[in-house]
Design a protein with these regions (language model features):
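Non-catalytic, solvent-exposed segments at the cell envelope interface
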Residues: 1-178
Length: 178
């Protein structure tokens, strides 16, 4: 997920894009037909490809994963750069496909399936621990973006992001089967 409502116009200049917010690696076990989601902190330090303002590769740098997306064009090239950084982080794990979605898009996607139901692990900002809630619209974004002022705030946020993605995938699969 991209840390912005909608794609910004970079004016064709590389290095002007938003940062990634949620970085989730989907691992498909085709033999056992299982999906595992691995959340990767946007603050994870990794080797990033650095591009100049025209998009030419000028080297690498060690920096936060969130910055990989920002070095690109805010679209496919940003996804390629983030995918390459995640691959390196996992010892050159092949990543055959990738995608990104802006915050407005995740709200629209969740709304398109009639919302998703999740159970918060902790109480915060209008959500109660252990009380299932069906997320739609702005509440979806509030749920996945809230960051507590604690050392575990980022980890809790990543868990909620993963929880929403898994609930969304399960709901879409259930609707396809109907």
């Amino acid at each position: 997920g991209v840390d912005e409502e909608v794609k910004q116009d970079t004016g064709g200049v590389y290095g002007n894009a938003n940062q990634s917010d949620a970085n989730i690696l989907a691992v498909l076990d085709m033999r056992n037909q299982e999906l595992t989601l691995v959340s990767i902190s946007r603050d994870a330090m990794c080797t990033l490809d650095v591009l100049d303002s025209t998009g030419a590769h000028v080297g690498t740098a060690t920096a936060q994963l969130a910055l990989a997306y920002s070095y690109g064009d805010g679209a496919e090239r940003s996804c390629e750069l983030t995918s390459a950084a995640v691959s390196r982080l996992f010892y050159d794990l092949p990543i055959p496909a990738y995608g990104s979605i802006y915050m407005q898009g995740i709200r629209q996607l969740v709304d398109s399936v009639g919302g998703v139901t999740v159970t918060p692990d902790a109480s915060f900002s209008g959500f109660t621990a252990g009380q299932p809630v069906t997320l739609t619209g702005q509440r979806t974004e509030n749920y996945i973006r809230y960051r507590a002022d604690s050392t575990e705030g980022n980890n809790q946020r990543m868990q909620r992001q993963k929880q929403v993605v898994l609930a969304l995938v399960n709901k879409m699969l259930a609707q396809v089967k109907e």
